[in-house]
Amino acid sequence: MLINNRIYNIDTNSRHWAISLALIVILSVIMTFIPFVGLCLSLMFFRQRFAPILFIIFSFYFGWFYEPQMDLLVHYEHFHRIADKSLVEQWMDSGTSKYGKEIYPVLFKYFIGLIADNRNFFSACACVVYTSLFIFGVVKPLQPLYMQKMSIPAWLLFLGVIFTVEYYWFLGFRFWSGAFVFTGFYLRSLNSGAVKYLWLSALCICFHYSLLALCVAAVLNLLLRYRFKVYYLILIVSFIVRFAKIAFVTNIAQFGIFENYVKESVRNQNIIQSVGKYAEEIREYGNQFYLLRETIAVFGVLAVIYILYKKIGKEFWEQNVKFWGFCILLLSFANFGYVSLTFYDRFFKLAVLFLYVFTYMWVMDIQSKLSFKSQLLITMVTII
């Protein structure tokens, strides 16, 4: 079991739910006039029961004032055009096939259309869904750990987990919300061993078709079990595919079974070539710090894992090899999709997130065994 399910409850208000509820109502009224208060309070009292609720309320205001941009703007424009149609008519609309025919975007647009056709409201609701699923997928599974006293290395890794996820990802609309659905159920599956969570993690496909890759990785991880030579062989092959610039993902997307499911931009050769040229230009002339920061983060977290392995031993690693194996598969899948800038960027960030979660759990498990020298070394590596 990855996490001890016993939560160290230091929240005195949790004994009196009525008091907590009244506090939430009062703070919500205050946030109506000063939304930033909710963010500050949710961060200051992140261990308290009301913190996630305040954070979600703040996300509504954040999305409202941020307004749709990038992918979210495209979906809003499509929503604006079909808002007065029935659910069936929206499903059959040509734009639905073009921008995503998964269950989540279709139902989201339909139910928002029943309330209001307003771009600020559309963005606010998208941000609320994204934030709620982030809490479900990342924050809640780690709650039994961050409720405990944490050492400096644990704090830094916990912050690494939280800040790996960036605020503007809600503009992706479909992908990251679905990714957090998978993360939430899969972490629960690893922790409890319950097969039902593994099945439920497949719900991520209802958000974005590319998340099928996560389901494939989960099943492959289940089948491979402890055959780590195969894991590392897959990783080596993925690097060969990456540096040879083989369009592995787009070639798979050409299969007939994806014809009515994936977006046209993934199957149209002219669009694929244009996107490929754009990706090369971005990687060559784009902001190198932004492009390399996840790579630097991976090397940092792998260095911490190496230190833990050498200084403390491999007991935690042996108990949680399934988690480690999934991290290896995620890195491999990201490499397989390197030619596609969007696919690689998304799945590499997911791999970074899972590696940080794995390392944070490891440090929390053995922090009492860490010497001052080891803590200092991990702290320096994590900061760098």
Residue ranges and their predicted role:
Residues 48-53, 231, 315-327, 371-379:
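Membrane-interfacial loop-to-transmembrane alpha-helix junctions, especially the N-terminal start
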Residues 68, 73-76, 82-83, 88, ...:
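Alpha-helical transmembrane segments and terminal signal-anchor/GPI-anchor hydrophobic tails
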Residues 73-80, 92-117:
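Short hydrophobic/aromatic helix or loop-helix immediately within or flanking a transmembrane segment
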Residues 125-145:
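Transmembrane-helix motifs of polytopic, lipid-linked glycan transferases
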Residues 138-161:
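Transmembrane-helix signature of polytopic, membrane-embedded enzymes
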Residues 165, 196-220:
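Membrane-interface alpha helices of multi-pass inner-membrane proteins
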Residues 166-182, 207, 304-366:
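Membrane-water interface signatures at transmembrane helix termini and the short loops
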Residues 179-196:
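Membrane-interface transmembrane helices that cradle and orient dolichyl/undecaprenyl
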